[in-house]
């Protein structure tokens, strides 16, 4: 899938959920809310190309954590929001992958976690959360957000 087609599709979607005068934080929250409420989770996907993953999600309306991450990254990129992709470190050989983002609402000075993948039964909201919040959730849920912290900027403490 060529990036121009995917970008055009994202731009059309963004016209419905953000405005030019919105602050970066509001754009992040609007994108988060849209992705969480307009797509459904399916079990697996091809994880070789995030642009293709975003396109598949926008076309089919469903995907796994990689597709959620990919469509979110696409929307953030099109809004000019600095973001960094994060990949979970596997806790054991057959552990699953997981993908989410670190996002900055101040032009790249500080970052917060953003994970649009829905959670079954717990309703946790991972929109602009700190390392402490995400780590507490991860520790209580079998290391679901373990990551090599040396690869990513630390979030503010509060």
Feature roles, as predicted:
Residues 67-135:
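Hydrophobic/aromatic-rich core segments of domains that either
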Residues 3, 21, 62-65, 127:
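Flexible, glycine- and charge-enriched loops at secondary-structure boundaries
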Residues 123-158:
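Low-complexity, Gly/Ser/Thr/Pro-rich intrinsically disordered linker/tail segments
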Residues 53-56, 60, 109-115:
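Short, well-ordered strand-loop elements centered on a beta-strand within folded domains, enriched
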Residues 42-55, 62, 80-95:
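Catalytic cysteine-centered active-site loop
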């Amino acid at each position: 899938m060529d990036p121009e087609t995917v970008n055009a599709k994202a731009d059309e979607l963004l016209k419905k959920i953000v405005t030019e005068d919105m602050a970066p934080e509001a754009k992040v929250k609007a994108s988060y809310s849209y992705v969480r409420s307009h797509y459904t989770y399916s079990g697996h996907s091809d994880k070789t190309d995030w642009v293709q993953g975003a396109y598949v999600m926008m076309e089919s309306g469903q995907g796994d954590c990689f597709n959620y991450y990919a469509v979110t990254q696409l929307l953030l990129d099109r809004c000019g929001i600095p973001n960094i992709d994060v990949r979970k470190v596997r806790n054991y050989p057959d552990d699953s992958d997981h993908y989410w983002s670190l996002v900055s609402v101040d032009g790249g000075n500080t970052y917060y976690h953003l994970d649009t993948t829905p959670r079954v039964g717990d309703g946790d909201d991972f929109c602009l959360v700190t390392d402490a919040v995400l780590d507490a959730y991860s520790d209580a849920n079998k290391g679901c957000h373990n990551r090599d912290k040396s690869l990513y900027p630390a979030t503010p403490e509060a």
